[in-house]
């Protein structure tokens, strides 16, 4: 944007904002921050997923995210508007809900060729809901954007392509790329039918992760 465009945005923002915790109100953030951008042209959106959606709304997050994407494409009059989504980093508060949110983000990305997602599960901080090393998250998001929408030869984020239940004590995950871990295979969990997370051992060979 040029200087005149920024000045116009500031005037619109001051008109639209509500100083009484607008971000907590329905459509508050959109009306206060996004609405003033009406009429501008954008190639894509980088979406840093927040944590407010984990409080009971995580199971329907794919529907909410798809609705947001459709709404923004209509608002900016651009059906080809791309979305690059940074998944949530891990945090001690209700970690299962975080996993559900990230799973829903992956579902949306797989169902829309104009949506990609960057995985940040390993970037969590036990003492801070906001990851400290934003550079890593930004780099991953940029690499996924360049790879998916600009044809750049960047390494793909690790994703599970398929899985095989070998027995009631062994599961194999088949990844999209060979997996290399700096600090060994730790932090793996499985979710039981009753909804409980269980720690498990993991061994890695090429693109196959075996959980026991």
State where each predicted segment sits.
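Cell-envelope and extracellular/periplasmic
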Residues: 1-212
């Amino acid at each position: 944007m040029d200087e005149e465009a920024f000045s116009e945005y500031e005037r619109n923002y001051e008109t639209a904002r509500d100083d009484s915790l607008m971000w907590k109100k329905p459509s508050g953030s959109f009306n206060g921050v996004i609405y003033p951008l009406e009429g501008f042209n954008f190639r894509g959106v980088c979406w840093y997923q927040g944590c407010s959606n984990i409080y009971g709304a995580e199971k329907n997050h794919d529907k909410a995210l798809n609705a947001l994407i459709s709404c923004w494409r209509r608002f900016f009059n651009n059906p080809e508007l791309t979305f690059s989504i940074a998944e949530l980093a891990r945090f001690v508060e209700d970690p299962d809900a975080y996993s559900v949110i990230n799973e829903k983000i992956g579902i949306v990305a797989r169902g829309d060729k104009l949506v990609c997602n960057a995985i940040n599960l390993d970037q969590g901080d036990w003492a801070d809901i906001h990851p400290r090393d934003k550079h890593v998250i930004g780099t991953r998001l940029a690499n996924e954007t360049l790879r998916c929408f600009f044809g750049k030869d960047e390494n793909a984020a690790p994703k599970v392509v398929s899985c095989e239940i070998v027995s009631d004590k062994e599961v194999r995950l088949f990844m999209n790329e060979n997996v290399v871990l700096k600090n060994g295979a730790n932090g793996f969990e499985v979710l039981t039918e009753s909804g409980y997370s269980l720690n498990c051992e993991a061994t890695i060979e090429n693109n196959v992760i075996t959980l026991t």
